């Protein structure tokens, strides 16, 4: 099969200048030409003229031949339905139908299963919806409950009869007298006590005021507090000043808010832990039928006795009036004093003794036990 040949035609118009128009021509295998042209022009009155020659074929054969399209149209808008003029009237109906279809799609199918949710209920009722957490005011006056903070202590003398009230009245009368107020005849003959006389220097001395006399105690005891409210705080874990505990010195001094204590102690949790461990050991030994408390005590006492020396480190003889130094070394009293006159340090560890020799009660106790055993043996 021979390939198709495309030719060009010239379209001429009677009323307009000559223009070029695209006309599809195909040539069949036997040489006959096929012409497909657009019979309409832009002006409407144009005539199409065929200016090419297509061989020896007649025009009747050309009209009877089937037109073949060479260029393939794009298929992008193949599935798009073009809107016709008659569809304008049915626009409103189509919109209503589409909305009905959408509403029908959104309707959920009934489900018999139970579902639980923490969100608000979607059921609509006649009552208006309220938020989940809503608190209404009771619209009442707040109950006055001060827990006894305004209670008054009535065990003391009444404030209008105590020493301070008497002194205030005396100073008030003296103030009136200094201002030149006239006195009654009955007032001059009435004795008002040693503090009732007119003080002509009251305006020049500061001590004639209650604020300055309170500390001096010139008008009796101070008033007790009428309103008492005690708050106690138990600090089971006091904050220790680290600087003072390690060095014995704190730059803040007495104003330091932490406790100044250099003692070593165990916190509560550590004490409880040790007690629980000891209880576990005791219960285990009790279940096994073993009593280790007495045995351990005997072992500890034996170890302590074995740790004590049996003779003086200097004279290598049994102790005579044994003494012990700060470094826990035992000597005879005579040997220790004699060595101290020559050397101020310990004979064993060469540490300063500071001249301190305490009585060795452990050695004396052991010597007494040995003496009693020897007497019983005799």
Curated annotation (Swiss-Prot):
The biased composition feature labelled Basic residues covers 73-82
The RING-type zinc finger ranges are 312-350
Region (Disordered) location: 14-150, 283-303
What name appears for this protein in its UniProt entry?
Zinc finger CCCH domain-containing protein 51
Polar residues composition-biased segments: 56-68, 114-125, 140-150
Name the domain of life: Eukaryota
Where along the chain is composition biased (Acidic residues)? Answer: 290-303
Q: What are the recorded GO MF terms, alphabetically?
A: DNA binding; zinc ion binding
**Keyword field:** DNA-binding, Metal-binding, Zinc, Zinc-finger
Zinc-finger (C3H1-type) residue ranges come to: 235-263
User: Compositional bias (Low complexity) spans?
Assistant: 29-46
Instruction: Name the Gene3D superfamilies for this protein.
Output: Zinc finger, CCCH-type, Zinc/RING finger domain, C3HC4 (zinc finger)
């Amino acid at each position: 099969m021979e390939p198709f040949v495309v030719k060009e035609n010239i379209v001429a118009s009677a009323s307009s200048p000559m223009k070029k128009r695209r006309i599809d021509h195909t040539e069949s295998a036997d040489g006959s030409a096929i012409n497909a042209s657009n019979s309409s022009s832009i002006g409407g009155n144009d005539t199409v003229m065929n200016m090419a020659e297509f061989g020896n074929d007649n025009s009747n054969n050309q009209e009877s031949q089937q037109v073949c399209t060479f260029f393939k149209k794009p298929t992008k808008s193949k599935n798009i339905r073009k809107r016709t003029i008659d569809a304008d009237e049915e626009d409103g109906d189509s919109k209503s139908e589409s909305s009905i279809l959408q509403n029908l799609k959104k309707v959920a199918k009934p489900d018999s299963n139970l579902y639980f949710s923490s969100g608000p209920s979607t059921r609509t009722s006649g009552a208006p919806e309220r938020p989940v957490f809503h608190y209404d005011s009771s619209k009442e006056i707040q109950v006055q409950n001060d827990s006894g903070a305004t209670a008054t202590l009535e065990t003391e003398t009444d404030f209008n009869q105590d020493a301070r009230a008497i002194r205030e009245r005396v100073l008030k009368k003296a103030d009136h007298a200094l201002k030149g107020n006239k006195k009654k005849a009955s007032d001059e003959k009435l004795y008002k006590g040693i503090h009732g006389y007119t003080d002509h220097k009251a305006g020049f001395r500061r001590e004639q005021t209650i604020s300055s006399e309170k500390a001096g105690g010139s008008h009796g005891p101070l008033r007790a507090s009428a309103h008492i409210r005690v708050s106690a705080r138990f600090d089971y874990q006091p904050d220790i000043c680290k600087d003072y505990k390690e060095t014995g010195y704190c730059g803040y001094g007495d104003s330091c808010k932490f406790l100044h204590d250099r003692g070593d102690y165990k916190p509560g949790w550590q004490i409880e832990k040790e007690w629980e461990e000891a209880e576990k050991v005791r219960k285990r030994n009790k279940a096994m039928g073993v009593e280790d408390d007495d045995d351990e005590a005997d072992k500890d006492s034996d170890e302590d006795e074995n740790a004590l020396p049996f003779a003086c480190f200097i004279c290598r003889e049994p102790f005579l009036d044994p003494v012990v130094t700060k470094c826990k070394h035992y000597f005879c009293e005579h040997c220790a004093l004699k060595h101290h006159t020559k050397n101020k340090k310990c004979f064993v560890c060469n540490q300063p003794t500071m001249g301190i020799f305490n009585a060795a009660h452990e050695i004396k106790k052991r010597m007494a036990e040995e003496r009693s055993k020897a007497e019983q043996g005799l």
